[in-house]
Amino acid sequence: KALSQTEPNLIIEFTEFDWGGDYYRKNGIMMPEDGVEMLKSYDSIYFGSAGDPDIPDHITLWGLRLKICQGLDQYANLRPVKLLPGISSPLKNVKEKDIDWSFIRENSEGEYSGIGGRSHKGYSHDTSMDVTLFTRHGVERIQKYAFEIARSRPRKLLTLVTKSNAQRHGMVMWDEIFAEVSQDYRDVTTDKMLVDAMTTRMVLDPKSIDTVVASNLHADILTDLAASLSGSMGIAPTGNLDPDKRHPSMFEPIHGSAFDIMGKGIANPIGSYWSSVMMLESLGEVNASKRLMLAIEKLTSEKKVLPRDLGGESSTQDITTAMIDIITGKNK
């Protein structure tokens, strides 16, 4: 809202939906049955977090966030990772330029396809099954998107992460399709890593990494590690994208609801701000996007107003006020 007040050509209209834990307590569902249809008329979606200490996690996730992502076919999850000015990595001798990554996560199928079941619950032969589903269509389109992202970055380096030594069907297909798609992107340098080895590489040789593409589960885990290596989970943004622009994309910080600090006013809002940067860029508001990113970098580089997870003592409201002051020019 502060940006729209200082950008003469930026007009943003907000509609807020009360979907989530409180809505579930009243209605027995996380969002209306026609909620996905309601969202289709909007240009973009700005998401807070899904979770409630009194509601099982699988209900809050599948009833809201995943329902939106899959319902709007937001098949590409883009997660930029960067060491912001003034922020220290827990890794030794890591410079700002050493962590500048772009993770692309398959966001529509794979380990989170939702296929499976459970029987004989409560008996000794209680049985459950979750099915990992990979389709050529799904794998090919996310890999092509990842190649496009890698091509747009200065280093033009793309790493494929799988576990094809142990997962000998679906992950082998990932490897095979990657080899095929790479033929159309000969200007992009490629390499492959097993997911367990990738965690070691991220810690021991972070500057060797640029753009990474992985399955739904693997990228979900790797990007939590990536966020922590860049300073804090509270910094990291993400975009759930429909690159084909048939439906609106959705932007959110990657962290969950953080029940242990809920209501204390100490949450780190930087991930939410950075998600707004991504949203504005996707809407074509390049100038506003750049201004907001510069404001974030000014905030972190000055180190005057920082949340507790970044070594400061400022409240969420203090940080928000400081950001507004930077954007509106009150903080010169």
Predicted stretch roles:
Residues 314-332:
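Phosphate-binding loop/pocket of nucleotide- and phosphate-handling active sites
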Residues 9-33, 200-202:
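N-terminal beta-loop-helix "entrance" segment that forms/cooperates
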Residues 25-129, 217:
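N-terminal glycine-rich phosphate/adenylate-binding segment common to multiple enzyme folds
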Residues 9-14, 153-162, 185-193, 285-291, ...:
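Flexible, glycine/charged-enriched surface loops at secondary-structure junctions
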Residues 1-7, 123-195, 208:
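Glycine-rich phosphate/diphosphate-binding loop of Rossmann-like nucleotide-binding domains
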Residues 20, 86, 193-200:
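Short acidic loop-to-helix transition motifs that present clustered carboxylates
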Residues 21-24, 78, 201-304:
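Glycine-rich phosphate/nucleotide-binding loop
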